[in-house]
Amino acid sequence: MIKIYDTMTRSLQDFIPLNEGKVNMYVCGPTVYNYIHIGNARSVVAFDTIRRYFEYCGYQVNYISNFTDVDDKIIKGAAEAGMDTKSFSDKFISAFMEDVAALGVKPATKNPRVIDYMDEIIDFVKVLVDKEFAYEANGDVYFRVSKSHHYAKLANKTLEDLEIGASGRVDGEGEIKENPLDFALWKSAKSGEVSWESPWGKGRPGWHIECSVMATEILGDTIDIHGGGADLEFPHHTNEIAQSEAKTGKTFANYWMHNGFVNVDNEKMSKSLGNFITVHDMLKSVDGQVIRFFLATQQYRKPVNFTEKAVHDAEVNLKYLKNTFNLPIQENANDEELEQFVKAFQEAMDDDFNTANGITVIFEMAKWINSGHYTSKVKETLAELLEIFGIVFQEEVLDADIESLIEQRQEARANRDFATADRIRDELAKQGIKLLDTKDGVRWTRD
């Protein structure tokens, strides 16, 4: 049985879906005002891997990941670029789709956009106002946190701790809010900003209400899994829970999952430190599969430390797996140990999707394969396990000229013409083909 570390309970829980054989997942997507950075990619890759493992286990997964296309940063960025907010968002949505495709990420079942759910957002806020979970103040609408009895549970803090932190922040809302923790459901329009008509005047939604509406509209009042980066625990996911459960009276999500951060040379990634790395830029020099494999080297909840050496190591290890995958099949080989590797892999992944341990099993399996255990069944299984990580190797086919040289070398060795055999080997090495003579014949790998 799959066990999930649930952030809400701070414990491993057996995964029991709402509907047998089906998984409904909502994962918070990007705010589309720039190219995604490597930290954003960690979340995308982590939850794509989780989705793929569910599917490997036979589940039907309804995977929803949104685009936040109404936001202060988008308004500011569009104005600076001399574009309308939709065209500006469209640009970075297209860039996002290209970047994650290069990382081998499967398309979501649906990628909802905020602008397509404005009527539903307004209706949601109206219900909260009618139930007195929200109040209007100067054209803004705020959620009344004092009525949410378990508000701080996901953040694992006391309400008093959060209030102290919120009261220390100075903003223009402080004088009109009943409580420093109250958060905006609807913001009144400022001059020149994109806005929509509402019962409270022209305005736009707050960030947190957007995800609650899209998640419940598509997946229903209660969903199986809600995921995102660890930075979203508070306030974003905390506020999602408060407003969603206030409206429906039901548990919003049964499992809360949060991935760890990506550090750069053991420092937090930030523009101020000059270590801000976008996937768009990284893909110019590093293959997408290498980036993805690097991100999978740690279990999703743990931080990943980005260094040039770590990425290089991922490239070397991936090349080893690729060369293993392209070894010649030996149908008469002994593959009785295969099921032991599969069982060990599944045990690793069932334990809260421990990709680090899962990859360790794959490398143990690769070592076993290289010792002469590569049947068609083994190759098919290796491909299935690698695909969970979004790694798909294409069958390598040698050019006819190279195949001819390998055959000529074999003939030279048979005739004990080792000078010719060595010359051909060196010539092939210059073309990136490395030969290995074994008791079962010659094997080749591509450097």
UniProtKB/Swiss-Prot annotation:
Residue interval(s) of motif 'HIGH' region: 30-40
Keywords, comma-separated and alphabetical: Aminoacyl-tRNA synthetase, ATP-binding, Cytoplasm, Ligase, Metal-binding, Nucleotide-binding, Protein biosynthesis, Zinc
Residues the record lists as binding Zn(2+): C28, C211, H236, E240
Cofactor: Zn(2+)
Motif ('KMSKS' region): 268-272
GO CC terms of this entry: cytosol
Domain of life: Bacteria
Entry-linked CDD domains: CysRS_core
Major enzyme class: ligase
InterPro entries: Cys-tRNA-ligase, Cys-tRNA-synt_Ia_DALR, Cys-tRNA/MSH_ligase, CysS_C, Rossmann-like_a/b/a_fold, tRNA-synt_1_cat_dom, tRNAsynth_Ia_anticodon-bd
EC number in record: 6.1.1.16
Main location: cytoplasm
Entry's cofactor comment: Binds 1 zinc ion per subunit.
Family: Belongs to the class-I aminoacyl-tRNA synthetase family.
Assembly, per entry: Monomer.
PANTHER family, per the entry: CYSTEINE--TRNA LIGASE, CYTOPLASMIC (PTHR10890:SF3), CYSTEINYL-TRNA SYNTHETASE (PTHR10890)
UniProt xrefs under NCBIfam families: cysS (TIGR00435)
UniProt protein name: Cysteine--tRNA ligase
Encoding gene (name): cysS
